[in-house]
């Protein structure tokens, strides 16, 4: 289970520790009544539409000319990615988009890129996009089947942001697990790299502390604070694809 604040951010370690302390305490807790808790929104179809509208609005490109293959990991993206990518002019095909409650992440998605890489090469696609089961992560493969991990996503998107004057603080936030290649890339491109402890929450806290705009992990959690409050695989995919379309 993931709990978010009213501002859309993951809870800090200190807040989670206080909640855990309360739960484990033997002292009786005063429980709030229904009227004090708030209201539940149950419009699932509207929520799905709102989500797709939002993600589509995060880029300006129509992605025309791209041939994309997306792996939905038999998970959350299966319900949203086809309609989302259908909003753009790219040709997009999908694999592993038939969840049955058991096959999520099973030999597919961002943790198993073999099927996607082979299918991209076989089908002559420009790019392959892979989500994980809950679609908060995104990795990609190029036209040769080569893996584009989270560090490479950070590098490509940050360089594009720098060239457009959008890289606030001239900084990428990554973790101590980042590849040395990312460090070398940043040195060569004159970009500052700040590394945090492992975990996208640590990355986000550092980004918010200094108003940095891009950060993430090698595993595919990427955060663009210009458009979101947490990592989202479908947002990441569109941000990367927009750079690809823009570069021709």
Language model regions located:
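Phosphate-binding and adjacent anionic-ligand microenvironments
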Residues: 127, 164-248
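Glycine- and other small-residue-rich loops at beta-strand/loop junctions that grip anionic moieties
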Residues: 40, 44, 70-73, 105, ...
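Gly/Ser/Thr-enriched, mixed-charge loops and adjacent short helices
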Residues: 2-123
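Predominant activation on well-ordered alpha-helical scaffold segments within soluble catalytic domains
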Residues: 20, 53-56, 79-86, 114-121, ...
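Short hydrophobic/aromatic-enriched beta-strand-loop microsegments
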Residues: 89-96, 147-152, 190-198
